[in-house]
Amino acid sequence: MMNEKALCTARELAIGYGKTPLLSDICLGVQPGQILTLIGPNGAGKSTLLRTLAGQLAPMGGTVLLAGKDLTAYTGTQRAQKLALMAPHSRRMELTTCFDFVSAGRYPYTGRLGILSAEDRQQVHRALELVGAVHLADRDFNRISDGQRQRILLARALCQQPEVILLDEPTSFLDIKGKIELLTILKELAHTGQLAVILSLHELELAEKIADTVVCVSPAGVSGVLTPEQAFQPENIRALY
């Protein structure tokens, strides 16, 4: 299910820390307008895989391609203009409005001084609009709900104007309403905005509803790219967990 249209591709990728790979022989790809969902037990390597695809960890083998080009050929700024990672955020931000927090996503465009142009401010407003959070712009980031915080984190990633967005457990700590709302936004962004999305999820029922394609990650290894029908067969889920 991988082809030349894939925006983010892993070829025979090996990932991990230290000298021994955690997982190897990983092959996957995601196209514009497509959502690829990673499922599997805790500690299997989903976060490590996402961080490697994002360029935060160096591969221990194999290749990551972004828009057909080796990820290592991009500068950090060039990579950030094409790919964004939304990871869990726990650090407290002192007296930071949601607008200012989202505007930090403009760093690939503002240069070292971080001065926002009119275009930058427009992109911040657009990102807040896309996630339904314009009304939070002037609120203190520390004083909003978990569901609102996830929307703001997503808006900051979208502010980079990426072609690919990676999300590590974006529904963690949300109630069921918050989970559904966030995944609905993601689905709209992918299918209407032609964004390529790779995300990890624990909730299998939600993963089955949102996924266009699925990759199963377990300590024993990583599957190829599967259809939801293949991935969520009862015997496959029993073997995975």
What are these regions (language model features)?
Residues 39-41:
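The feature captures the beta-strand-to-loop junction immediately N-terminal to the Walker
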Residues 165-168:
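Catalytic Walker B motif of ABC-type/P-loop ATPase nucleotide-binding domains
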Residues 161:
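Conserved catalytic motifs of ABC-family nucleotide-binding domains
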Residues 115, 140-144, 148:
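Conserved ABC ATPase signature
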Residues 54:
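Helix-to-loop junction immediately C-terminal to a conserved catalytic motif
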Residues 62-70:
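Conserved ABC transporter NBD signature motif
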Residues 103, 118-136:
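Conserved ABC ATPase "signature" region
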